[in-house]
Structure formats: structure tokens, C-alpha cells
Design a protein with these regions (language model features):
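PRPP-associated nucleotide enzymes
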Residues: 1-171
Length: 171
């Protein structure tokens, strides 16, 4: 395991993103975190903003237990609140193929929010197979499998404070 982005760098960047988002949404924003990977990012991002932020969560699965996508997307938990007429910001840990967010944006657009944008901590642009417009990006990273700060490998390592590259598949 090798540290790719340290805790300090993550926290610094999240503060910058929070300040930018706060400026863009002076009347408040409805944050939608994608379970479970985005939970740490969402918690820190929300506290980096001084505007009103409502929190909601949605569950989507597109990955199996390993490092590759199953290519299949399904909603595993829906939102608690309606997004109709709201300024909505989807908060995601990482955009990889784009399949998950491309699908989710279609679903949410049908519910007629006033505005709909995406904040993603990490972006692997080389891997994109479906178009996704990400308005706020923390870091662009190369095509490597990362864990920590919410990101998992087979549900492990989410609680690491740094973002690390998993170089070998653990036994
Ligand atoms: P996409 O649909 O391929 O864009 O995949 C997005 C989802 O795949 C993210 O929400 C993550 O849960 C997962 N994912 C993609 N790349 C990584 C990675 O490097 N580490 C951990 N999870 C990843
Ligand atoms: Mg995820």
C-alpha cells in the first residue's frame, strides 16, 4: 500500500471545494451522498461550507466485490426527500467509467430539480466510457485502484485517513 494523497492534502482540497461551493450556492444546497464511499467526503465537505446544506443519501451498486465493475447499475437505497425544485449537488467519491453517475443523473433529472451538479473527490478521466460532467473535482488521478477516505476494496480500508494505492491484491 502506497500513499497517493495524504490526509493533509485531502483536507486542504476539501476546504477549497467547500469555499467554492458555498460561493456558488448562497441560498443553500441539497447534498446527495452516494453510499458508502462518499460518506467521509460528504461529512468533511458539508462542514467546509457555511451555507445551509441539507443531507440525503442514495445507494447505488455498480461494482461487485472486486476491482472491476459489473457493468450493471442498480438503486439499492432511494433518497428520503424529494429533489423537485431544489438545487442539488451529488457528492461522489470517485468517477471511474462514469457508468454509475451517468445512470444516476438520468434518474435524478427526471425528478426535476432546479439545478443538478456533481462534486467528486477523485476523477480517473482515462477510464471514462460514459460521459459525465463533473463541476467540482478534488483530484485527477491516474488509472490505479485506490482505497481509503471512504474508498474500499471488498468493503475494507474505507476508514484509512489517506488515499492509498492498493498495489497487490491481499490474500
Ligand atoms: P464508475 O461507475 O465506473 O464511474 O464507478 C464509480 C464507483 O466505482 C465509485 O463510486 C467507487 O465506488 C468505485 N470505484 C471506482 N474506482 C475505484 C477505486 O479506484 N477504488 C475504489 N472504488 C472505486
Ligand atoms: Mg461508490
Amino acid at each position: 500500500m502506497r500513499v497517493l494523497i495524504s490526509e493533509e492534502k485531502i483536507q486542504q482540497r476539501v476546504r477549497e471545494l467547500g469555499a467554492q461551493i458555498e460561493k456558488d450556492y448562497p441560498d443553500g444546497v441539497q447534498l446527495i451522498g452516494i453510499l458508502k464511499g462518499a460518506t467521509f467526503f460528504l461529512a468533511d465537505l458539508a462542514r467546509a461550507m457555511k451555507c445551509q446544506a441539507r443531507l440525503d443519501f442514495i445507494g447505488i451498486s455498480s461494482y461487485g466485490k472486486g476491482k472491476t465493475s459489473s457493468g450493471e447499475v442498480k438503486l439499492t437505497k432511494d433518497l428520503d426527500a424529494t429533489v423537485e425544485g431544489a438545487d442539488v449537488l451529488v457528492v461522489e467519491d470517485i468517477v471511474d467509467s462514469g457508468v454509475t453517475l451517468n445512470y444516476l443523473m438520468q434518474v435524478l433529472r427526471q425528478r426535476r430539480p432546479k439545478s443538478l451538479k456533481i462534486a467528486a473527490l477523485l476523477d480517473k478521466p482515462d477510464r471514462r466510457i460514459r460521459p459525465v460532467e463533473v463541476s467540482y473535482v478534488g483530484f485527477q488521478i491516474p488509472d490505479e485502484f485506490v482505497i481509503g477516505y471512504g474508498l474500499d476494496y471488498a468493503e475494507n480500508y474505507r476508514n484509512l485517513r489517506d488515499i492509498c494505492v492498493l498495489e497487490e491484491t491481499p490474500a
